C-alpha cells in the first residue's frame, strides 16, 4: 500500500523553526524516519512538503483519485483552509491528521481544525512519533 505523507507550510523549516515547540528533527530526517518505518511495516511512504496550498490540493486530489491513504500535517492551513478541508472530504481512503505540537495547549486560534471533522483520526502533541503511529495504524487496516 502506498501512503501519501503531506506536510504543509513551514514544515520544511523543521529543526530550525521554533525547536522548543517542534523539536530538532529536520524535514529530511523526518522523511527518512517515515520511509524506514513504512518499509518495516510493508508500506511505501511518499513524503512531500510544500508551502503552496495549490500544490497540497493537487497532492490530495491525486491521493483521492488513486484511493491512497493520507497522513497530513497541514501546518497553519489546518486552521484556515476550507479548500483543503473540501479536498480532504473527497478522500475515500483514511486521512490521519498529524500535528507535532499539542495545538490544544497553544494559542486559541490553533485549537480549531477544518480538517478534523473529515479525518479518520487525529494525532497531536507526540512530536514526530505521531507520523510513525499513523503509519502503524494504517498498516493494521485492510488494504
Curated annotation (Swiss-Prot):
The record marks 17 as: Transition state stabilizer. Keywords: Amino-acid biosynthesis, Aromatic amino acid biosynthesis, Lyase. The active site is at residues 22, 99. The keyword Amino-acid biosynthesis applies. InterPro entries: DHquinase_II (IPR001874), DHquinase_II_CS (IPR018509), DHquinase_II_sf (IPR036441). It catalyses: 3-dehydroquinate = 3-dehydroshikimate + H2O. Pathway: Metabolic intermediate biosynthesis; chorismate biosynthesis; chorismate from D-erythrose 4-phosphate and phosphoenolpyruvate: step 3/7. Its EC number is 4.2.1.10. Pfam families: DHquinase_II. Gene3D superfamilies: Dehydroquinase, class II (3.40.50.9100). Substrate binds at residues 73, 79, 86, 100-101, 110. SUPFAM superfamilies: Type II 3-dehydroquinate dehydratase (SSF52304). It is an enzyme of class 4 (lyase). GO terms for molecular function: 3-dehydroquinate dehydratase activity. One of its GO terms (biological process) is aromatic amino acid family biosynthetic process. Belongs to the type-II 3-dehydroquinase family. Catalyzes a trans-dehydration via an enolate intermediate. Homododecamer. This is 3-dehydroquinate dehydratase. It comes from Mycobacterium avium (strain 104). The lineage of its organism: Bacteria, Bacillati, Actinomycetota, Actinomycetes, Mycobacteriales.
Amino acid at each position: 500500500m502506498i501512503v501519501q505523507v503531506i506536510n504543509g507550510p513551514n514544515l520544511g523549516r523543521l529543526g530550525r523553526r521554533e525547536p522548543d515547540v517542534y523539536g530538532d528533527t529536520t524535514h529530511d530526517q523526518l522523511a527518512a524516519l517515515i520511509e524506514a518505518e513504512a518499509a518495516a511495516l510493508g508500506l511505501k511512504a511518499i513524503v512531500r512538503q510544500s508551502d503552496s496550498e495549490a500544490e497540497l490540493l493537487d497532492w490530495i486530489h491525486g491521493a483521492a483519485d488513486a484511493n491512497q491513504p493520507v497522513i497530513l500535517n497541514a501546518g497553519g492551513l489546518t486552521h484556515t483552509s476550507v479548500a483543503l478541508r473540501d479536498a480532504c472530504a473527497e478522500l475515500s481512503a483514511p486521512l490521519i491528521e498529524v500535528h507535532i505540537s499539542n495545538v490544544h495547549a497553544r494559542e486559541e486560534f490553533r485549537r480549531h481544525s477544518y480538517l478534523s471533522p473529515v479525518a479518520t483520526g487525529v494525532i497531536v502533541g507526540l512530536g514526530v512519533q505521531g507520523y510513525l503511529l499513523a503509519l502503524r495504524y494504517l498498516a493494521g487496516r485492510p488494504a
